[in-house]
């Protein structure tokens, strides 16, 4: 029987922000409740000279069911006692996008090919998660080797999210576009 209490989930040991920095392509995601980036999602993580991590992300969002825009999101990360667990404050460059302050956990990464991120926004009384989201990131938008896919699938199962992810297309929709020159 798998333990699905969020407090039991393991994260990346000795997580190294500096090695994690750079460009990551979202290959799959498990959605939370509410408006969220849909596809063509690319995140850029950076670490400043004081060791503070921040990120920008771009992706396609569908508004009002039929209006597609490329949205820019910004996030700042506050460290916690565990180097792989952050509080992420995020907001959209445009006011209609979601903003919030979520847990942002790096469940696993090899820094070179893949990363699995997890966030629980709301706990059930039994300690399991009522509203979570998770991204599988790749350094290369063409995806993973079978060996890496196996590790990623295992991590998804450990998060009690097996078969709840959908693949994210990268078809160039947002290349060179941002909401500033679409809206």
UniProtKB/Swiss-Prot annotation:
- GO biological process entries: retinol transport
Q: Does the keyword Disulfide bond apply?
A: yes
Subcellular locations according to the entry: Secreted
The modified positions for Omega-N-methylarginine read 121
Assembly information from the UniProt record: Interacts with TTR. Interaction with TTR prevents its loss by filtration through the kidney glomeruli. Interacts with STRA6.
Family membership noted in the UniProt record:
Belongs to the calycin superfamily. Lipocalin family.
Q: What is this protein called?
A: Retinol-binding protein 4
């Amino acid at each position: 029987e798998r333990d699905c209490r969020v407090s039991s989930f393991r994260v990346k040991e000795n997580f190294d922000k500096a090695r994690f920095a750079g460009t990551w392509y979202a290959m799959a995601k498990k959605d939370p409740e509410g408006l969220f980036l849909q596809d063509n999602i690319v995140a850029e993580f950076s670490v400043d000279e004081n060791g503070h991590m921040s990120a920008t992300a771009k992706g396609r969002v569908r508004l009002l069911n039929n209006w597609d825009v490329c949205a820019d999101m910004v996030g700042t990360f506050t460290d916690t006692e565990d180097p792989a667990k952050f509080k992420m404050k995020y907001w959209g460059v445009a006011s209609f996008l979601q903003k919030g302050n979520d847990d942002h956990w790096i469940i696993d990464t090899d820094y070179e090919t893949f990363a699995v991120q997890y966030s629980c926004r709301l706990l059930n009384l039994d300690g399991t998660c009522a509203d979570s989201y998770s991204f599988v990131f790749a350094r290369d938008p063409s995806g993973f080797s079978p060996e890496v896919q196996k590790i990623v699938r295992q991590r998804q199962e450990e998060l009690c999210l097996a078969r709840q992810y959908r693949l994210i297309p990268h078809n160039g929709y947002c290349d060179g576009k941002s909401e500033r020159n679409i809206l």
